[in-house]
Curated annotation (Swiss-Prot):
Zn(2+) binds at residues 16, 19, 38, 41. PANTHER family: ATP-DEPENDENT CLP PROTEASE ATP-BINDING SUBUNIT CLPX-LIKE, MITOCHONDRIAL (PTHR48102:SF7), ATP-DEPENDENT CLP PROTEASE ATP-BINDING SUBUNIT CLPX-LIKE, MITOCHONDRIAL-RELATED (PTHR48102). This is ATP-dependent Clp protease ATP-binding subunit ClpX. GO terms for cellular component: HslUV protease complex. The gene is clpX. Pfam families: AAA_2, ClpB_D2-small, zf-C4_ClpX. The lineage of its organism: Bacteria, Pseudomonadati, Pseudomonadota, Gammaproteobacteria, Alteromonadales. Component of the ClpX-ClpP complex. Forms a hexameric ring that, in the presence of ATP, binds to fourteen ClpP subunits assembled into a disk-like structure with a central cavity, resembling the structure of eukaryotic proteasomes. The keyword Oxidoreductase does not apply. GO terms for molecular function: ATP binding; ATP hydrolysis activity; ATP-dependent protein folding chaperone; protein dimerization activity; unfolded protein binding; zinc ion binding. ATP binds at residues 121-128. GO terms for biological process: cell division; proteolysis involved in protein catabolic process. SUPFAM superfamilies: Glucocorticoid receptor-like (DNA-binding domain), P-loop containing nucleoside triphosphate hydrolases. ATP-dependent specificity component of the Clp protease. It directs the protease to specific substrates. Can perform chaperone functions in the absence of ClpP.
Length: 426
């Protein structure tokens, strides 16, 4: 490198003292006392420092474990209702990470792992609760669909792929992945097809439950590293799943009838009883709250699998008032999200109270819970969002009940206080 420096001193080509590239091969060459550094080497140094900070940060976050009250308060900011489920989750998650921090007690007692089972209708907030908890704890979060899983050796997704997803979320940092949270949705769909074991293989039902057993309880899973297929000679990553918190969720349609039959608390003849009216809907939530392991066995989950999910939380079906709150109150409420999108066009978006009620009623009629709200709002605003970037002078867009019902277009207010329906401008 001595020659390169001499060339620079004599007014000839300058070279980076670190990588040896000439001043013509880089965008910028910074001079120091008898030394030169290029912009590429500066960026590389920044990347190295950022990686080191990333490695230190999780340990600091790990030392600050939120209390159950703090976890519950964080959930309240993003999830409406489900108070009982929030409390159960907050305590279970707090105990799980407390176990990771402390290991065994002074008396040498090993603390067992408490994975969680969430039971509740579609759109009641199961996925959002799990995702929000992971975000509040600053740990990796991965989601899997139980219906896509099959036993090893069959066409479909192996259960080990769940750990692969978790590793991808934290750039294949094994230590970080081992403190993560995995949410497995549609867990009720892998229930055994009948009470009696079948002669034929049930590769997407009981077989998947068997495959998930060790993973959920705790095992050392071998996962191919990043780009493992391209570099088969690389060693597999060893991930200890005993430190990963597994949360399983499902709607468990018809489970209330199984519980009713056991407890003899139904209004009819168990499985023959029909569910009618709002009062009976509330009763279903109460019945699900009385679920016992034997009910889940009768539903089709094998006893060993239920034993790996000792913490059970039931979620209630969201009513119209809860859906209205979901639209406007949480930190990431849909009205706030779309309001932010309109704000980027320098336009204020207003949803009137009657519009929120109409959207909630439409979601109730679709029986999709909170999950259906986004598609409804997207449909209402689609034409306006399409035209808005090309329409000049709009300062405000107003959505009322008639817009939701499709009887009129959104009201656009212009700089000169002129008011027109959205379709009136092209």
């Amino acid at each position: 490198m001595g020659d390169n420096k001499n060339n620079g001193d004599s007014g000839k080509l300058l070279y980076c003292s670190f990588c040896g590239k000439s001043q013509h091969e880089v965008r910028k060459l910074i001079a120091g006392p008898s030394v030169y550094v290029c912009d590429e080497c500066v960026e590389l140094c920044n990347d190295i420092i950022r990686e080191e900070i990333k490695e230190i940060s999780p340990k600091r976050d790990h030392d600050k474990l939120p209390t159950p009250h703090e976890l519950r308060n964080h959930l309240d900011e993003y999830v409406i209702g489900q108070d009982k489920a929030k409390k159960v989750l907050a305590v279970a998650v707090y105990n799980h990470y407390k176990r990771l921090r402390n290991g065994t007690t002074k008396e040498g007692v090993e603390l067992g792992k408490s994975n969680i089972l969430l039971i509740g209708p579609t759109g009641s907030g199961k996925t959002l609760l799990a995702e929000t908890l992971a975000r509040s704890l600053n740990v990796p979060f991965a989601m899997a669909d139980a219906t896509t899983l099959t036993e090893a050796g069959y066409v479909g997704e192996d259960v080990e792929n769940i750990i692969q997803k978790l590793l991808q979320k934290c750039d294949y940092d094994v230590e970080k992945a081992q403190r993560g949270i995995v949410y497995i949705d549609e867990i009720d769909k892998i229930s055994r097809k009948s009470d009696n074991p079948s002669i034929t293989r049930d590769v997407s039902g009981e077989g998947v439950q068997q495959a998930l057993l060790k993973l959920i309880e705790g095992t050392v899973a071998s996962v191919p590293p990043q780009g493992g297929r391209k570099h088969p000679q690389q060693e597999f990553l060893q991930v200890d799943t005993s430190k990963i918190l597994f949360i399983c969720g499902g709607a468990f349609a018809g489970l209330e009838k199984v519980i009713e039959q056991r407890a003899h608390t139904g209004t009819g003849i168990g499985f023959g009883a029909e569910v009618k009216g709002e009062q009976d809907k509330a009763t279903i939530s109460q019945i699900l709250g009385q679920v016992e392991p034997e009910d889940l066995v009768k539903y089709g989950l094998i006893p060993e699998f239920i034993g790996r999910l000792p913490v059970v939380a039931t979620l209630t079906e969201l009513d119209e008032s809860a859906l209205i709150q979901i639209l406007s109150q949480p930190k990431n409420a849909l009205t706030k999200q779309y309001g932010a999108l309109f704000e980027m066009e320098n336009v204020e978006l207003e949803f009137r109270e009657d519009a929120l009620k109409a959207i909630a009623k439409k979601a109730m009629s679709r029986k999709t819970g909170a999950r259906g709200l986004r598609s409804i709002v997207e449909g209402i605003l689609l034409d306006t969002m399409y035209d808005l970037p090309t329409v000049k002078g709009v300062v405000k867009a107003v959505i009322d009940e008639s817009v939701v019902k499709g009887e009129s277009d959104p009201i656009l207010i212009y700089e000169n206080n002129d008011t027109k329906a959205a379709s009136g401008e092209q």
